[in-house]
């Protein structure tokens, strides 16, 4: 398993836990709200992490019970990681299946591991980020471990400012 993936799994897990944990809420600092996106910083063992995140504006199917979904772009300077794109859709993804992100005519593949999915290739991450800066919406399409398809629609209003704020605070 690639080292970047292992590190991503660990850090994304921390971000999710911090995002939902009242105990750790004081460690998580919002540094800007930009329409549908928000930027945060957190210090974990003297490791500063910055990330832009959003929640879906629409989740389908509506009656499917699951935990919250998030789309992230993260920066971890101590590990020389920048522009890391990841998502969680609130359930365990189907094993050995690709999670898709669609924006307009462009499609990007995410590698799924349990509750998280990442773009593993840095060039693809850059292409995806550029697409997000130009688009107004992105859809994340995944399947549960039982095969049920979900689609999370994210607004990209405010993405560029949230992204730039995260990047600036962790450079």
Residue ranges of model-derived segments:
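Bacterial N-terminal signal peptides that target proteins for export
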Residues: 1-10
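A generic "folded-domain core" signal
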Residues: 24-171
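Catalytic cores of transferase enzymes with a strong primary signal for eukaryotic protein kinases
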Residues: 5, 21, 46
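Bacterial N-terminal signal peptides
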Residues: 10-19
């Amino acid at each position: 398993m690639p080292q970047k993936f292992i590190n991503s799994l660990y850090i994304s897990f921390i971000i999710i836990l911090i995002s939902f944990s009242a105990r750790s809420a004081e460690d998580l600092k919002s540094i800007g709200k930009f329409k549908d996106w928000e930027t945060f910083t957190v210090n974990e063992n003297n490791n500063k992490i910055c990330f832009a995140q959003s929640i879906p504006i629409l989740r389908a199917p509506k009656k499917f019970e699951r935990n919250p979904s998030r789309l992230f772009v993260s920066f971890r300077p101590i590990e020389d990681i920048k522009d890391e794109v990841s998502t969680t859709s609130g359930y365990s993804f189907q094993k050995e299946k690709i999670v898709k992100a669609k924006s307009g005519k462009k499609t990007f593949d995410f590698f799924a591991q349990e509750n998280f999915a990442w773009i593993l290739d840095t060039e693809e991450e850059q292409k995806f980020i550029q697409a997000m800066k130009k688009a107004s919406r992105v859809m994340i399409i995944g399947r549960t471990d039982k095969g049920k398809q979900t689609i999370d629609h994210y607004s990209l209003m405010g993405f560029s400012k949230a992204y730039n704020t995260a990047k600036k605070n962790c450079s």
